[in-house]
Amino acid sequence: MSNPVVLNLHLISDSTCETVAAVARSALEHFKSVEVNEFVWSCINSYEQIDKIMLTIEKDKYNFIMYTMFDDDIRKYLKQKAGIHEIPCIPILSHVIREISCYLNIKKDPYINTSIGLDDEYFTRIDAINYTIAHDDGQNLWDIDQADIIILGVSRTSKSPTSIYLAYRGYRVVNIPLINSIELSVDLSKMKNKLIVGLTIDIDRLIEIRRARLVSMKNQNNYGYVDYEHVLMEIRETKKICAKNGWPIIDVTQKSVEEIAATIIQYFTKMQH
């Protein structure tokens, strides 16, 4: 079997690199056989920084540069340096900007500082991630009123990964496990301005997931955790609570975290209008 092609992908931006990274990763989805080493160079705004990047690049390897750079002089310098070493250097936004400029017959602004907006978005996302991690699995509910979204569900219904995914999108999320015979420590029925969503799942699939969990934890004596009647009662109680309060409920059976999160975002967007 031949060795895979290894590509050193250098992502360069005068801001956070999130835009160029998203485009690059999407493009590389079309090359599954390629092994990618990703190097992220953010907040690059000087000739000296570009010189340092070039010094770190292993010239005898496959290298590829993708960038977003709004300062014309810095951008030209980057392309010049890449050209000297015969490294492909691709601007991900230039073609789009050029097409808009030609279509409208308007010149683009010579310089526009996008770093402020991106930085605001970045720090909002970091704040959402920190908040969501601190409020995983029903923890720290004293400031639940600061959440954008509250997720309820029995154990192993993808509450935590869905919450983290939403946090990465900038939503502050609390997830709370619903456990039989244990009352919630907060009265969610009074939180009229919050999106509260319940997650449910096919009982056979849930038991299968829980059994695998017990095996991985070497704790196969927790019979109630996988008992059919007990699990059925948990699922029914979740549906009952959501129906009583008019909260939407999502069946996560065979759904990816991305699909679950997309549905929740749709509910959230609808609630805001």
UniProtKB/Swiss-Prot annotation:
Q: What family does the Swiss-Prot or TrEMBL record give for this protein?
A: Belongs to the pyruvate, phosphate/water dikinase regulatory protein family. PDRP subfamily.
What InterPro entries does the annotation carry? Kinase-pyrophosphorylase, PPDK_reg
Gene Ontology molecular-function annotations: ADP binding; ATP binding; phosphotransferase activity, phosphate group as acceptor; protein serine/threonine kinase activity
Is the keyword Nucleotide-binding assigned to this protein? yes
Q: Name one Pfam family in it.
A: Kinase-PPPase
What's the name of the protein? Answer: Putative pyruvate, phosphate dikinase regulatory protein
Question: What keywords tag this UniProt record?
Answer: Kinase, Nucleotide-binding, Serine/threonine-protein kinase, Transferase
Which residues hold ADP?
G153, V154, S155, R156, T157, S158, K159, S160
Protein source organism:
Ehrlichia ruminantium (strain Welgevonden)
EC number assigned by the record: 2.7.11.32, 2.7.4.27
